[in-house]
From Swiss-Prot:
InterPro entries linked to this entry: Flag_FlgI (IPR001782)
Gene: flgI1
HAMAP family: FlgI
GO MF terms held by the record: structural molecule activity
Subunit details: The basal body constitutes a major portion of the flagellar organelle and consists of four rings (L,P,S, and M) mounted on a central rod.
Protein name, UniProt field: Flagellar P-ring protein 1
Secretion signal, residue range per the UniProt entry: 1-25
Keywords on record: Bacterial flagellum, Periplasm, Signal
Amino acid sequence: MSVLIKTRHCFVLLGLWLVLPTASAQPLGSLVDIQGVRGNQLVGYSLVVGLDGSGDKNQVKFTGQSMANMLRQFGVQLPEKMDPKVKNVAAVAISATLPPGYGRGQSIDITVSSIGDAKSLRGGTLLLTQLRGADGEVYALAQGNVVVGGIKAEGDSGSSVTVNTPTVGRIPNGASIERQIPSDFQTNNQVVLNLKRPSFKSANNVALALNRAFGANTATAQSATNVMVNAPQDAGARVAFMSLLEDVQINAGEQSPRVVFNARTGTVVIGEGVMVRAAAVSHGNLTVNIREQKNVSQPNPLGGGKTVTTPESDIEVTKGKNQMVMVPAGTRLRSIVNTINSLGASPDDIMAILQALYEAGALDAELVVI
């Protein structure tokens, strides 16, 4: 009897050792996506109104046509050949992602982008419109005030200053879901897990960990991306099984670090552990100065002319001194960025340097531009 008890304790300790996470283990839910449970893209067209003279100009004909069609729906009839010239209106495209499992009445964020030649969408309001999927069906309704992160200022002579992108904005919770997208998650006999970052080692580790946790033949690695899992057929049991599955700790192996750059806002995010090989960096520095003044033209007293004011812009481009920076092998990228910042480089300059380092094979990381 004592031998049997000791044997049972041994199996219990062995099972605990197999389930306990290692130092580099991660929850399976953060490493994979479930096939069939995904977001779907939605798109729509509408008008943004209430702009302070920064809307589409007269040459954008479809904005006037859209405005006339909208007024006609409210019983306002315009003359047939009349082209409404409204500078406070801009034609826009609306895009959104419908997350998996979202039902009727839930809200999602939307992105509003100018189609015509509007200068800015700041302060505008999106009129009610339908958002459709790839099948042409309506899945959501969108409306709300546009939040713009960019700004554009323009002088009388045509010189202007633009910060970020003023013709693209967002509306948090700006769309209401009206139809749920069906999923085959409950109908398939197996559940397929797709690794977010494909790797043969990671796929094999996922299959081994699931077989240890739920029994042999529970999971099979099909490729570097897919892992097939046998799941219960009952809906409630399948949901409970998936909740346990997402918490299983997986040793995903070493993942390559990333450098992410947002081309719209100039934001640079550097992951931990990004290293650089030996290289030399030199980047030109251009400074553009625009000075604007108004000149007054006074006619002769007896000439019968009028006093006019003409704008004059003086644009000066200054090229700064190029400085070569030597980068020793094994240097962390964070130290390089700090050095580049000390030279007065902007985020766009930093991104240009990172792209050059990546193309030269000196950047040991994955470069992602969003």
